[in-house]
């Protein structure tokens, strides 16, 4: 671990000439305003050490990475019963595909595509008003990161609400198949706010550390989930965490991870560290172009791939 900062510095040096690559998500107006000339990366090891480079302290919209935290909350509420509502298979389709949902009678393929995450939000809402469910998620993420300064960006949430026609279609579809219990606009209110969580690489790596450490946060002593559940969440991230680029990410990086269209990628080296990288420019399947490149370099230089070095 001693030379981890040197490894990060070398990755940053190699990435530097490429900063600005990829295309910023433009279908959410607030995200279209983000400066693409940014790159940050943070690693938190299971013994609590933090390593960072670049814009690692700049908060960004974590978007779909929030689905990992919502999934953790939903499993805490209903356990394995969740899998009656959502599958565990890679989709191979775009993250907002409607065709697959119709074909499979309103049961989304996995909890990380939009339809699956909307179903998960519906589960978390049980017994809550939308505002309470959003509050529960925010408290949970602050607890995980041990950081009360984490916020939800209302401008981004509003921006998504105004342009999220396809998500409304997905939710109405599931409601028609009786796979949503709450009114569509309530569920999507929660969903758009969870996606608008704003965190820095360091905050994100801290929040996800429990997944690298068998379900407990070694720095705070908080027990979050059982080792078995942490392992299973990691398995889902490895197979389904990057939309229809999941196989490619497993091939090149070999770590469980979850991407978001805000340009963030969260990744886990089980037993070793949690990693967050951010660069707003996306590749054609909606994953951070430089984020994925940096994680591939990290896996190659550390031997952390779950498939061995």
From Swiss-Prot:
Sequence positions that bind substrate: 64, 114, 160, 167, 191, 243, 261
EC number: 3.5.1.2
Keyword DNA damage: no
Xref: Gene3D superfamilies: DD-peptidase/beta-lactamase superfamily
EC class of the enzyme, as a word: hydrolase
Molecular function terms, GO-annotated: glutaminase activity
Signal peptide: none
Superkingdom of this protein's organism: Bacteria
Family (UniProt): Belongs to the glutaminase family.
Catalysed reaction equations from the record: L-glutamine + H2O = L-glutamate + NH4(+)
GO BP field: glutamate biosynthetic process; glutamine catabolic process
Organism (species): Rhizobium johnstonii (strain DSM 114642 / LMG 32736 / 3841) (Rhizobium leguminosarum bv. viciae)
Protein name: Glutaminase
Binding partners and assembly: Homotetramer.
Keywords, comma-separated and alphabetical: Hydrolase
This protein's record includes keyword Hydrolase: yes
PANTHER family xref list: GLUTAMINASE (PTHR12544:SF29)
């Amino acid at each position: 671990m001693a030379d981890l900062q040197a490894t990060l510095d070398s990755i940053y040096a190699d990435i530097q000439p490429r900063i600005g690559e990829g295309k910023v998500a433009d279908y959410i107006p607030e995200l279209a305003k983000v400066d693409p000339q940014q790159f940050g990366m943070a690693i938190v090891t299971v013994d609590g050490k933090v390593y960072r480079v670049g814009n690692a302290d700049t908060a960004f919209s974590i978007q779909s990475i929030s689905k990992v935290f919502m999934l953790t909350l939903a499993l805490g509420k209903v356990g394995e019963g969740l899998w009656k509502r959502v599958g565990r298979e890679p989709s191979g389709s775009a993250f907002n595909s409607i065709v697959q949902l119709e074909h499979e009678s309103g049961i989304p393929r996995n909890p990380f595509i939009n339809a699956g995450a909307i179903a998960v939000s519906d589960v978390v809402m049980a017994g809550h008003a939308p505002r309470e469910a959003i509050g529960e998620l925010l408290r949970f993420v602050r607890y995980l990161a041990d950081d009360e300064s984490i916020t939800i960006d209302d401008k981004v949430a509003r921006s998504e609400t105004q342009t999220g026609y396809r998500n409304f279609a997905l939710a109405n579809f599931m409601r028609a198949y009786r796979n949503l219990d709450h009114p569509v606009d309530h569920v999507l209110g929660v969903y758009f706010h969870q996606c608008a969580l704003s965190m820095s690489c360091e905050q994100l790596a801290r929040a996800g550390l429990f997944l690298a450490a068998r379900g407990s946060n070694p720095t705070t002593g908080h027990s979050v989930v059982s080792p078995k559940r942490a392992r299973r969440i990691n398995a889902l991230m490895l197979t389904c965490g990057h939309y229809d680029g999941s196989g490619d990410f497993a091939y090149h990086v070999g770590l469980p991870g979850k991407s978001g269209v805000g340009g963030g990628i969260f990744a886990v080296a089980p037993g070793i560290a949690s990693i967050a990288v951010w660069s707003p420019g996306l590749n054609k399947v909606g994953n951070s172009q430089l984020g994925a490149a940096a994680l591939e370099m990290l896996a190659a230089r550390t031997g952390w791939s779950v498939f061995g070095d």
